[in-house]
Amino acid sequence: MARVTVQEAADKIGNRFDLILTAARRARQLQLHVREPLVPEENDKPTVIALREIEKGLINGSIMDQLENSDAVRQEVAEQEAISFLTDIQTNAYFYSFNDG
């Protein structure tokens, strides 16, 4: 079991309130497997891993903002590609049904 000193993690972030917000955001990423842990998992829960990452200075609020922004851009690109793909399928289906009829 990992020992995490909340005070050390709070000192890295600035205060306990921002620590809770940052740790919750990071733990959610880890829980949903959106991002891989930056420290060994050691059979710890996502919240403990998030706190360990913060304590080591690997994660903070601005890093979380950057990660979430890049994830949002990646998601938007994937959605646009899916829309384009579906539009192509519909166009081709219409073309073939028009030429067959």
Swiss-Prot record:
Its EC number is 2.7.7.6. One of its GO terms (cellular component) is DNA-directed RNA polymerase complex. Keywords: DNA-directed RNA polymerase, Nucleotidyltransferase, Transcription, Transferase. InterPro entries: DNA-dir_RNA_pol_omega, Pol_omega/Rpo6/RPB6, RPB6/omega-like_sf. It catalyses: RNA(n) + a ribonucleoside 5'-triphosphate = RNA(n+1) + diphosphate. Pfam families: RNA_pol_Rpb6. SUPFAM superfamilies: RPB6/omega subunit-like. One of its GO terms (molecular function) is DNA-directed RNA polymerase activity. GO terms for biological process: DNA-templated transcription. Belongs to the RNA polymerase subunit omega family. The RNAP catalytic core consists of 2 alpha, 1 beta, 1 beta' and 1 omega subunit. When a sigma factor is associated with the core the holoenzyme is formed, which can initiate transcription. Promotes RNA polymerase assembly. Latches the N- and C-terminal regions of the beta' subunit thereby facilitating its interaction with the beta and alpha subunits. This is DNA-directed RNA polymerase subunit omega. It comes from Haemophilus ducreyi (strain 35000HP / ATCC 700724). The gene is rpoZ.
